[in-house]
Every structure is written in C-alpha cells, then in structure tokens.
A protein has these predicted regions:
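Surface-exposed loop/turn motifs in large extracellular/passenger domains
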Residues: 78-83
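Conserved anchor residues at repeat-unit boundaries in beta-strand-based tandem repeats, strongest
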Residues: 10-21, 33-44, 57-68, 84-97, ...
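Beta-turn initiation residues at beta-strand->coil junctions
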Residues: 3-6, 25-29, 48-53, 72-77, ...
C-alpha cells in the first residue's frame, strides 16, 4: 500500500490496523529515506536510513524511531573532508556499549566502550603516531598509558593518570 501525505512525503509498504507494520519504505520531508521494519507507525527492527542533510547512512537495529542495539553509521563532513564510521552498540539514538569509531583520512581509531555518544569506560585510541589506552570518561582519557610509536616497531610507554603524565 502507498500513502502520500500533504507534505509530499510518502510511505509504501505493509499496513496493519491502519498503521505501518512490517516491511516498508518512506521518504520524509527532510529528504531522509528509510527502508526496513516498522511497528505501530514507528521505525522498529532492522532498517537502513539515508540522511539527506547529514551526509550519512545508518544500517542496523531500531526501537521506537531510535537507533538501538547493533548498527553501523557512516557520515562525512564535506567542509573538513573527513569520513566518520561507527560500528557497534546503540541505545536511545546514542553510541552506547562496545564499539569501534574511525575517523579518516587521519586514521584515528577508537575501540572500546561508549556511553551516551562519548568514549566512556575501557578503550584504546590509535593514531598514526601513538595510542592511548585506559579508562575514559565523557570522551577524555582519565587513567592509562600513552604509547608513542617511532619509525621502527619499537615504542615508548608513558603512564597517564588524571591528566598527568608519569
């Protein structure tokens, strides 16, 4: 069934009790496009959204119109020429739980725990020159080690605790 709304958005897919239920495709006034599962008029289950204004794509699980459980988000910044990728757990539309966050072309890679969209808990941030391993809170390393790479495979270890190098 296809429904066209007054704002020119539309839904095409399965319906139950006059509500979007099952597989469906929708184009929204914002320009966003969604294809996937619906439950009682909500994006719920597995699906893919292409964001028009954020230059991004999310593919994964949804619950009540929010990213939830496991998924992959890729978005780009045309101003800074950066590509961001997150693969991992989501809760209430935020990166939350275990995941991997990559920024290219700089090759920043964070592998670890997230809370409410920020690095929080145990994790390792890898850069081209060094790595930061330890406990993170609200996106900042609180306690851990910094390993500085040299041109050879050897590296120097530096301990880090409460914003102090030791």
């Amino acid at each position: 069934m296809k429904i066209v709304y007054s704002d020119n958005s539309f839904y095409e897919g399965q319906m139950k009790n006059n509500k979007k239920n099952g597989e469906g495709y929708a184009e929204f006034p914002s320009g966003n496009i969604y294809q996937g599962e619906w439950k009682n008029n909500n994006v719920d289950g597995f699906g893919k959204v292409i964001y028009a204004n954020k230059y991004g794509v999310y593919e994964g699980n949804w619950k009540n119109n929010k990213k939830h459980d496991y998924g992959k988000m890729i978005w780009t910044s045309t101003v800074l020429s950066k590509k961001h990728t997150y693969i991992g757990s989501w809760e209430n539309d935020y990166m939350h739980g275990n995941g991997k966050y990559i920024i290219e072309p700089q090759k920043y890679i964070y592998v670890g725990e997230f809370k409410n969209g920020l690095e929080d808990g145990y994790g390792i941030l890898y850069t081209q020159d060094c790595s930061f391993e330890g406990i993170w809170e609200s996106g900042r390393l609180q306690k851990g080690r910094i390993k500085k790479y040299r041109r050879s495979p050897r590296f120097k270890k530096i301990n880090y605790h409460s914003n102090t190098l030791k």
